[in-house]
């Protein structure tokens, strides 16, 4: 599975925030997205 982040505040980070960091698993991946991009996301 991969993690797809919503790009709230994506203007500040560009489209990279959509395809958030794939390192880590589960909650770590979600927190990584929030901490680095300020975005939420869903599993796809």
UniProtKB/Swiss-Prot annotation:
It comes from the Eukaryota. The keyword Repeat applies. GO terms for cellular component: intermediate filament. Keywords: Keratin, Repeat. In the hair cortex, hair keratin intermediate filaments are embedded in an interfilamentous matrix, consisting of hair keratin-associated proteins (KRTAP), which are essential for the formation of a rigid and resistant hair shaft through their extensive disulfide bond cross-linking with abundant cysteine residues of hair keratins. The matrix proteins include the high-sulfur and high-glycine-tyrosine keratins. Interacts with hair keratins. Belongs to the KRTAP type 20 family. This is Keratin-associated protein 20-3. It comes from Homo sapiens. The lineage of its organism: Eukaryota, Metazoa, Chordata, Craniata, Vertebrata. The gene is KRTAP20-3.
